[in-house]
A protein has these predicted regions:
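Short, polar/charged alpha-helical segment
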Residues: 46-68, 79, 242-243
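Bacterial lipoprotein signal-peptidase II cleavage site
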Residues: 27-38
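Extracytoplasmic ligand-binding site segments that recognize negatively charged/polar headgroups
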Residues: 44-52, 72, 76, 88-228
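A bilobed periplasmic-binding-protein/Venus flytrap-type ligand-binding module shared by bacterial periplasmic
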Residues: 144-151, 187-190, 263-277, 296-299
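Conserved C-terminal helix/tail region of periplasmic/extracytoplasmic solute-binding proteins
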Residues: 328-354
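Mature extracytoplasmic/periplasmic domains
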Residues: 270-331
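A ligand-binding cleft/hinge motif common to bilobed small-molecule-binding domains
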Residues: 99-103, 225, 230-250, 301
Length: 354
């Protein structure tokens, strides 16, 4: 999710890609039988990643496989998948949060058993599901605490301090029903505090203290720069990206309260997609994790989602990221929290957002 923009639902089938698909469909031999090229079908990618358009274009250029990209926030994409579960319209999903994939996996909606032949680092190995139903592509952290250094001389040092009167009406965050990284953050807080009921109590107190909620990272950061809030709790990539580069605010700084939650981004394949499309989805995953694909990930959204921690050996994070060793992190079990996502988001929207 990029820093200061709200995603719009974009269906991309670029002219070159569409023409390629038409040309391939028209490739037949003299006896009317399709040639090998006609085996290429359109791969439908649902994605909430800032570098997805660049990746789709690079993948098509490298393979000739036509791709239709539906770029949107995670919440709406998951709603689309649920609405079309009996007649799926997607082939590959790429969003942040292993909890979302665990939930889909437990519903039987993801292809199992595929793992690309790559050299995982520790983050990658830790993020792999046992049944190989999704593939990690990177890691960010939730939530980073972003603040204006000129207005906040002494930022909070613990999550509990956000409940104090000092920060009444000054804390902003995202809506988990819209923002993919936000449910894992909420689940992480519940995990840290000891359970769902303890987490609900915490967020109820935070709301009573004037919590302000916007849909996604971009609007929440805009609330910070406009002065509506003094503290913004967002995904680390968005927080770091707000501090440098074009359109950034040099007065902003990022702090990590203990603990923050590891947030894997991942790719999952629709179990009900045609075989040809699933095979193309596997090729897409392999390309993303190739040296060429990693270059696209690290350049396609340099002030947003490119600010991730790699999951592959031999790939270093961009220099703007702090050493992960300097941050206290926790990992939540996606198969524990994923099935709870719908219920927790419903509770959050009914009791905290409204």
């Amino acid at each position: 999710m990029t820093r200061f923009t709200t995603r719009t639902n974009v269906r991309i089938l670029a002219g070159a890609l569409a023409l390629g698909a038409i040309a391939l469909a028209g490739c037949t031999s003299a006896n009317g039988a399709p040639t090998s090229g006609s085996a290429k079908v359109t791969l439908v990618v649902y994605s909430a990643q800032g570098y997805d358009s660049a990746m789709v274009k690079a993948f098509h250029k490298a393979t000739g496989i036509p791709v239709s990209l539906d770029d949107n926030s995670t919440g709406p994409l998951l709603t689309q998948i649920e609405a079309s579960r009996n007649n799926p319209k997607w082939g590959l999903l790429w969003v942040d949060g292993a909890t979302a994939f665990a939930g889909l996996d437990q519903q039987g909606l993801l292809q199992k058993g595929f793992e690309p032949k790559v050299s995982w680092n520790t983050l990658g190995t830790q993020s792999l599901p046992a049944d190989k139903s999704y593939t990690p592509t990177g890691v960010t952290l939730v939530a980073a605490l972003v603040y204006n250094k000129t207005k906040v001389a002494s930022p909070p040092t613990t999550w509990q301090q956000l409940l104090s009167s000092q920060w009444k009406g000054d804390v902003g965050m995202n809506d988990p029903s819209q923002s993919g990284p936000t449910f894992p953050f909420i689940a992480g807080m519940m995990n840290y505090l000891g359970g769902v009921s303890q987490g609900e109590a915490y967020y109820s107190k935070l709301k009573a203290n004037g919590l302000i909620i916007h849909p996604t990272n971009g609007p929440t950061l805009q609330a910070l720069t406009s002065g509506q809030v003094k503290l913004a709790r967002v995904q680390s990539s968005a927080g770091i990206g707000s501090t440098f580069g074009p359109g950034s605010d040099p007065k902003l700084a990022v702090k990590y309260l203990n603990p923050v939650t590891i947030l894997p981004s991942a790719l999952g394949i629709d179990a009900k997609a045609p075989l040809a499309e699933r095979q193309e989805a596997e090729k897409f995953i392999e390309y993303v994790l190739s040296p060429a694909g990693q270059k696209v990930m690290q350049t396609g959204d340099p002030y947003g989602d490119s600010l991730y921690y790699p999951v592959l050996q031999g790939v270093s994070p961009l220099p703007e990221l702090p050493s992960l060793a300097s941050v206290t992190t926790q990992t939540i079990n996606p198969y524990t929290w994923g099935p709870r996502e719908a219920a927790i988001n419903t509770w959050f929207d009914a009791n905290i957002v409204r």
